[in-house]
Amino acid sequence: MLFACALLALLGLATSCSFIVPRSEWRALPSECSSRLGHPVRYVVISHTAGSFCNSPDSCEQQARNVQHYHKNELGWCDVAYNFLIGEDGHVYEGRGWNIKGDHTGPIWNPMSIGITFMGNFMDRVPAKRALRAALNLLECGVSRGFLRSNYEVKGHRDVQSTLSPGDQLYQVIQSWEHYRE
């Protein structure tokens, strides 16, 4: 049985990751990033953009482009900072993806973590259930594909940097997740 599960995971059949919206679909600008992450990654850092929320594919694609534009054109980074962006439409938008180091949490955490951000401000409200479900599915996908350790740890952005991110309400939610560690 263990061999069958390992084979399914190796073939990518155990958990489908087809729910991830590729960069080409949300019309991302080309990335200029090249620093790669080593796998499997031990940490996942959850943040929020603290900006506008989105709840439809069109508005979330636009919001992902807005975040990328700000990071590339205003901050001068090589791409959108995050590995993945979560919309309240229930979709995961590919940022830098599983293989490229992000710019989401500073020089200590970026090389050893996947950065997942929820698009919107979650100080006073919880993200839609479908967005939370999408994030948990993404984490399962990462484990099944060997990008995340099976014993990965989820951290809130505020656990590793001085910030209010991921917002009070989202922070309260992620603290209940199985892999959350302060």
UniProtKB/Swiss-Prot annotation:
<keyword id="KW-0391">Immunity</keyword>
<dbReference type="GO" id="GO:0031640">
    <property type="term" value="P:killing of cells of another organism"/>
</dbReference>
<dbReference type="GO" id="GO:0060090">
    <property type="term" value="F:molecular adaptor activity"/>
</dbReference>
<dbReference type="GO" id="GO:0051701">
    <property type="term" value="P:biological process involved in interaction with host"/>
</dbReference>
<feature type="disulfide bond">
    <location>
        <begin position="54"/>
        <end position="60"/>
    </location>
</feature>
<dbReference type="GO" id="GO:0016019">
    <property type="term" value="F:peptidoglycan immune receptor activity"/>
</dbReference>
<dbReference type="GO" id="GO:0042834">
    <property type="term" value="F:peptidoglycan binding"/>
</dbReference>
<dbReference type="GO" id="GO:0061844">
    <property type="term" value="P:antimicrobial humoral immune response mediated by antimicrobial peptide"/>
</dbReference>
<keyword id="KW-0044">Antibiotic</keyword>
<dbReference type="GO" id="GO:0032827">
    <property type="term" value="P:negative regulation of natural killer cell differentiation involved in immune response"/>
</dbReference>
<keyword id="KW-0053">Apoptosis</keyword>
<dbReference type="GO" id="GO:0006915">
    <property type="term" value="P:apoptotic process"/>
</dbReference>
<dbReference type="GO" id="GO:0045087">
    <property type="term" value="P:innate immune response"/>
</dbReference>
<dbReference type="GO" id="GO:0005737">
    <property type="term" value="C:cytoplasm"/>
</dbReference>
<keyword id="KW-0399">Innate immunity</keyword>
<dbReference type="GO" id="GO:0005615">
    <property type="term" value="C:extracellular space"/>
</dbReference>
<protein>
    <recommendedName>
        <fullName>Peptidoglycan recognition protein 1</fullName>
    </recommendedName>
</protein>
<dbReference type="InterPro" id="IPR002502">
    <property type="entry name" value="Amidase_domain"/>
</dbReference>
<dbReference type="Pfam" id="PF01510">
    <property type="entry name" value="Amidase_2"/>
</dbReference>
<dbReference type="GO" id="GO:0030544">
    <property type="term" value="F:Hsp70 protein binding"/>
</dbReference>
<comment type="subunit">
    <text>Homodimer; disulfide-linked. Interacts with HSPA1A; this interaction forms a cytotoxic complex that is released by lymphokine-activated killer cells. Interacts with HSPBP1; this interaction blocks the cytotoxic activity of the PGLYRP1-HSPA1A complex.</text>
</comment>
<dbReference type="GO" id="GO:0050728">
    <property type="term" value="P:negative regulation of inflammatory response"/>
</dbReference>
<dbReference type="GO" id="GO:0016045">
    <property type="term" value="P:detection of bacterium"/>
</dbReference>
<feature type="domain" description="N-acetylmuramoyl-L-alanine amidase">
    <location>
        <begin position="39"/>
        <end position="167"/>
    </location>
</feature>
<feature type="signal peptide">
    <location>
        <begin position="1"/>
        <end position="18"/>
    </location>
</feature>
<dbReference type="GO" id="GO:0032689">
    <property type="term" value="P:negative regulation of type II interferon production"/>
</dbReference>
<comment type="function">
    <text>Innate immunity protein that plays several important functions in antimicrobial and antitumor defense systems. Acts as a pattern receptor that binds to murein peptidoglycans (PGN) of Gram-positive bacteria and thus provides bactericidal activity. Forms an equimolar complex with heat shock protein HSPA1A and induces programmed cell death through apoptosis and necroptosis in tumor cell lines by activating the TNFR1 receptor on the target cell membrane. In addition, acts in complex with the Ca(2+)-binding protein S100A4 as a chemoattractant able to induce lymphocyte movement.</text>
</comment>
<dbReference type="InterPro" id="IPR006619">
    <property type="entry name" value="PGRP_domain_met/bac"/>
</dbReference>
<keyword id="KW-0964">Secreted</keyword>
<dbReference type="InterPro" id="IPR036505">
    <property type="entry name" value="Amidase/PGRP_sf"/>
</dbReference>
<dbReference type="GO" id="GO:0008270">
    <property type="term" value="F:zinc ion binding"/>
</dbReference>
<dbReference type="InterPro" id="IPR015510">
    <property type="entry name" value="PGRP"/>
</dbReference>
<keyword id="KW-1015">Disulfide bond</keyword>
<keyword id="KW-0929">Antimicrobial</keyword>
<feature type="disulfide bond">
    <location>
        <begin position="33"/>
        <end position="78"/>
    </location>
</feature>
<comment type="similarity">
    <text>Belongs to the N-acetylmuramoyl-L-alanine amidase 2 family.</text>
</comment>
<keyword id="KW-0202">Cytokine</keyword>
<feature type="disulfide bond">
    <location>
        <begin position="17"/>
        <end position="141"/>
    </location>
</feature>
<keyword id="KW-0732">Signal</keyword>
<dbReference type="InterPro" id="IPR017331">
    <property type="entry name" value="Peptidoglycan_recognition"/>
</dbReference>
<dbReference type="GO" id="GO:0005125">
    <property type="term" value="F:cytokine activity"/>
</dbReference>
<dbReference type="GO" id="GO:0008745">
    <property type="term" value="F:N-acetylmuramoyl-L-alanine amidase activity"/>
</dbReference>
